């Protein structure tokens, strides 16, 4: 039986966006660091290889890694060999690569230094239990938000993303809560990049982002429904990490049939806002 033709990728297709969100492209790195003699390209490419595994489940071969990162296959082959020898990658029975638990030693060091993460845990769990949903703390990275803490109500972990998971910044409540803290010039830089990335979808998306930003600056939080996933709604508020002098965001999210929009606005949004204040809120506006 002939296989159906695969739908080609477009500049704004999910697959293309995933590559943009997962790691900085070679072109962007070359544009920024092409004249930097101290910049070590082999290190940058090795890190891009490791980041590529966040794009999909399962193991990846050298061809897939080359296509995903834009790095030449010969270079990928040398990098995967080196990373395997160092213990950061393993190979499965099909000889494809997957990340080794050895990588956790690097991540654990990062999490251990995020004091705000430890301070937020008890309050996050209380809100998760009360909402029968999940609560997460996310750190900004490029055009994504990376989960550094996640809690769920007992038996309600179906949508809980693990620590280290990424969600888009433009189409989530947690991302827009963070965007509300950016100075105007930084916000416009992101908008200029997203205009290209999202194409025809951008004008409407931009208006929704601006509405969410206005909500955060007026009410302290924003609610987004059906944009990250069609059946999910969430509320989020910014949080200030004094140790690292940076803004992050807290969200409470779950299935639409579980999280009533009225309770999100009247109960869980204010509770997230209260938790952010306890942790040391600092207004950027």
What are these regions (language model features)?
Residues 2-113, 117, 125, 277, ...:
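N-terminal helix-turn-helix
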Residues 2-25, 29, 156-228:
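Short, solvent-exposed recognition segments
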Residues 33, 206, 230-231, 246-285:
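Juxtadomain coupling helices with adjacent low-complexity linkers
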Residues 98-193:
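Amphipathic alpha-helical effector-binding/dimerization core
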Residues 233-237:
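Short hydrophobic beta-strand micro-motif common in sensory/regulatory domains
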Residues 239-242:
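Sensor-regulatory modules in signal-transduction proteins
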């Amino acid at each position: 039986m002939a296989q159906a033709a695969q739908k080609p990728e477009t500049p704004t297709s999910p697959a293309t966006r995933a590559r943009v969100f997962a790691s900085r492209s070679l072109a962007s790195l070359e544009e920024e660091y092409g004249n930097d003699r101290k910049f070590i390209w082999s290190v940058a490419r090795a890190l891009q290889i490791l980041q590529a595994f966040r794009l999909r489940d399962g193991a990846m071969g050298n061809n897939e890694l080359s296509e995903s990162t834009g790095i030449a296959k010969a270079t990928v082959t040398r990098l995967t060999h080196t990373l395997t020898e160092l213990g950061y990658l393993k190979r499965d029975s099909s000889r494809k690569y997957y990340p080794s638990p050895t990588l956790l030693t690097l991540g654990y060091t990062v999490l251990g230094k995020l004091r705000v993460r430890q301070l937020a845990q008890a309050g996050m769990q209380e809100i998760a239990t009360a909402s029968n949903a999940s609560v997460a703390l996310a750190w900004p990275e490029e055009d994504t938000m990376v989960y550094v803490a996640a809690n769920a109500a007992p038996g309600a972990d179906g949508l809980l993303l693990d620590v280290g998971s990424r969600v888009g910044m433009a189409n989530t409540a947690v991302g827009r809560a963070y965007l509300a803290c950016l100075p105007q010039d930084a916000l416009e830089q992101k908008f200029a990049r997203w205009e290209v990335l999202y194409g025809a979808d951008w004008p409407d998306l931009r208006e929704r982002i601006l509405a969410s930003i206005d909500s955060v600056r007026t009410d302290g939080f924003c609610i987004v429904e059906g944009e990250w996933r069609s059946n999910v709604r969430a509320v989020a508020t910014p949080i200030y990490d004094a140790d690292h002098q940076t803004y992050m965001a807290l969200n409470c999210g779950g299935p639409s049939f579980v999280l009533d929009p009225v309770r999100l606005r009247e109960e869980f949004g204010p509770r997230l806002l209260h938790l952010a204040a306890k942790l040391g809120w600092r207004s950027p506006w």
